[in-house]
């Protein structure tokens, strides 16, 4: 079954399969299935056409998913950078934006280590 441009795995439960769509997490998936009247433990391959249509309608009308959600997130980050707030500056410098330490760690955000010349550890005498 295709939903919002994503192939959902047919052998998984509906609540798990819906989380393959960007912008839909576990809680959203449960809410969508509850509104559509579908049991969360029902597999995607077992869904009737009416149930699949109901899920598509709910997602189309009430949720921002995939490319639209990604674009919204990028615009939000760009707005922070444009107004020059602290979080925006941290994004601009590719540093953690939520108060994590950066003296050590923060490698995911900072990237590969850059060696600085002239810094050697002093040996024991």
Curated annotation (Swiss-Prot):
Keywords associated with the record: Ribonucleoprotein, Ribosomal protein, RNA-binding, rRNA-binding, tRNA-binding
GO biological process assignments: translation
Gene Ontology MF term list: rRNA binding; structural constituent of ribosome; tRNA binding
Gene Ontology cellular component terms for the protein in this record: cytosol; small ribosomal subunit
Record-linked Pfam families: Ribosomal_S13
InterPro entries: Rbsml_uS13_C, Ribosomal_uS13, Ribosomal_uS13-like_H2TH, Ribosomal_uS13_bac-type
Domain of life: Bacteria
Region ranges (Disordered): 92-125
HAMAP family per UniProt: Ribosomal_uS13 (MF_01315)
Entry's family note: Belongs to the universal ribosomal protein uS13 family.
Purpose of the protein: Located at the top of the head of the 30S subunit, it contacts several helices of the 16S rRNA. In the 70S ribosome it contacts the 23S rRNA (bridge B1a) and protein L5 of the 50S subunit (bridge B1b), connecting the 2 subunits; these bridges are implicated in subunit movement. Contacts the tRNAs in the A and P-sites.
Assembly mode: Part of the 30S ribosomal subunit. Forms a loose heterodimer with protein S19. Forms two bridges to the 50S subunit in the 70S ribosome.
Protein name: Small ribosomal subunit protein uS13
The organism of origin for this protein: Chlorobaculum parvum (strain DSM 263 / NCIMB 8327)
């Amino acid at each position: 079954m295709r939903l919002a441009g994503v192939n959902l795995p047919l052998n998984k439960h509906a609540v798990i399969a819906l989380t393959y769509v960007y912008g839909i997490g576990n809680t959203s998936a449960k809410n969508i299935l509850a509104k559509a009247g579908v049991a969360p433990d029902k597999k995607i391959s077992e869904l009737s056409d009416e149930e699949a249509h109901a899920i598509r309608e709910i997602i189309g009308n009430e949720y921002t998913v995939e490319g639209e959600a990604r674009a919204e997130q990028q615009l939000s980050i760009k707005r922070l950078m444009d107004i020059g707030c602290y979080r925006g500056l941290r994004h601009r410098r590719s540093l953690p934006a939520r108060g994590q330490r950066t003296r050590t760690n923060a490698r995911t955000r900072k990237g590969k280590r850059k060696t600085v010349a002239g810094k050697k550890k002093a040996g024991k005498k």
